[in-house]
Regions:
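Beta-lactam-recognizing serine transpeptidase/beta-lactamase-like catalytic domain environment
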Residues: 1-21, 26-182
Length: 182
């Protein structure tokens, strides 16, 4: 009203967002580091729609017939949701904690030491196995620990079901450009 602009939040460091497709590279790197896949590993992406535990995962070209068989290199080139999620779910479905640990090893899920007011902390939760054998997260809803649902790992692998401030994505890709130094 007074013609002045006031920045109330530094969105780059403070706003939590689902990184979406920009996260696929991190997921693939974790699986490669753990020896589950290599650049020539092939995965069937079908006709662009794939059932994942009661939900349908789609690639952006699902209405044009999808991509069919792709190797890991092409999965990243095409930004295939199905390819990444099937590779990660296949490797880590029974051990999602190893996937999150791999993300942490890349520096993606760990808090950065930013001396900037309002800096956000990533929400990449480490699952642990409960006594009933289900995977639970270290967060609660109405006092009850939340379970890691069967489709959650697949969606996490393509940048959903987790949140990062945008600076984390920037730092990750800068690390790649700088030979691993973030």
């Amino acid at each position: 009203a007074d013609g002045e602009y006031y920045e109330t939040m530094n969105s780059v460091v403070g706003k939590l967002m689902e990184p979406g497709s920009t996260f696929k590279t991190a997921s693939i790197m974790v699986a490669m580091e753990d020896g589950h896949i290599n650049k020539n590993t092939r995965v069937d992406t079908g006709d662009g729609k794939w059932p994942m535990y009661g939900r349908i995962m789609k690639d952006h070209n699902w209405n044009k017939g999808g991509y069919g068989m792709l190797n890991v290199t092409r999965v990243l080139m095409k930004s295939s949701n199905i390819g990444v999620s099937r590779l990660i779910d296949g490797a880590y479905h029974d051990c999602p904690d190893k996937f999150v640990r791999g993300l942490n090893n890349l520096g993606v899920g760990l808090p950065m030491d930013l001396d900037i007011p309002g800096s956000g902390r990533p929400r990449v939760y480490m699952p642990k196995k409960a006594k009933n054998g289900h995977w639970i997260l270290p967060i609660t809803r109405n006092g009850v620990p939340m379970e890691l649902g069967k489709p959650d790992l697949a969606w996490m692998s393509i940048g959903y079901a987790l949140q990062l401030p945008p600076i984390y994505t920037l730092a990750f890709y800068n690390g790649i450009a700088n030979n691993g130094r973030m």
